[in-house]
A protein has these predicted regions:
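Extracellular glycan-modifying ectodomains
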Residues: 1-245
């Protein structure tokens, strides 16, 4: 979307996968509630935040804290503009550390975590009060990327839980919508040529098709034409001129 000319704030806390961690980050951003020293933990010589991706980690606690709070402030400012908030849910499996849901395990030994799959009610109960506070529309998607650590059946149960939770939210909250990227890849593009070499992630062709369907669903003809032009200009800007000596 950035290449198409849209003003986008993408994954300000880093890539998040489970519904509860996304809620925790958005709640903090809505309140502009900054992180404090006791929100960080130290492991393997680095300071980390349980809410943030490892790219925020640093050997200096103050640097780590500043990076994390910059993300909180950026998200707060962006939400004040009442944007379209697109939320992609990846998995219903969550990790708990000392009773607290974490977004990233930061290579802490697995035995220190409790891991379990959320149920539909838990996801809805976490998201509904947050969405009632958000002054913007929320468009949910469910990631078609397969998480196969628990096998194919475990992945299906996780995705089904997310789909049912999103369906429940869109039934009761008028500002909530759903874009069917999951169904596009798993139903319409069942052929493995639409998957990358790892057989879990979508291929570039699949991503292009999903993006095309998104444009058709949510953009006017004029906007789609502007997007095509912006994308063309972006591709041209990425080409390097080769000069023969």
């Amino acid at each position: 979307m950035q290449a198409a000319g849209f003003d986008v704030l993408c994954n300000p806390f880093g890539t998040l996968y489970n519904p509860l961690s996304i809620v925790a980050c958005l709640e903090r951003a809505v309140e502009n509630r900054l992180m404090e020293d006791n929100d960080l933990m130290r492991h393997d010589g680095l300071w980390h935040s349980w809410l943030h991706h490892s790219r925020f980690s640093h050997s200096d606690k103050d640097v780590c804290l500043a990076r994390c709070n910059e993300a909180v402030g950026q998200t707060y400012s962006f939400l004040k503009r009442k944007p379209l908030l697109i939320v992609t849910l990846g998995t219903a499996w969550v990790y708990y550390y000392q009773g607290r849901v974490v977004a990233n395990c930061h290579k802490v030994p697995p035995r220190q975590f409790e891991r379990r799959r959320l149920n539909v009610g838990e996801i809805v109960s976490a998201w509904q009060p947050l969405m009632e506070r958000l002054a913007c529309a929320v468009l949910f998607t469910v990631s078609p990327i397969r998480h196969l650590a628990d096998g194919a059946h475990g992945n299906q149960l996780s995705k089904a839980t997310l789909l049912l939770a999103v369906d429940a939210l869109t039934e009761v909250l008028p500002q909530a919508g759903y874009f069917d990227s999951y169904e596009l890849l798993t139903d319409e593009m069942r052929d493995y040529r639409f998957y990358a070499r790892d057989m879990c992630h979508p291929s570039e062709v699949a991503v292009d098709i999903v993006w095309e369907r998104f444009r058709e669903a949510y953009m006017s003809a004029d906007t789609r034409e502007q997007v095509r032009q912006r994308e063309k200009e972006f591709r041209q800007s990425q080409h390097r001129t080769i000069v023969n000596a």
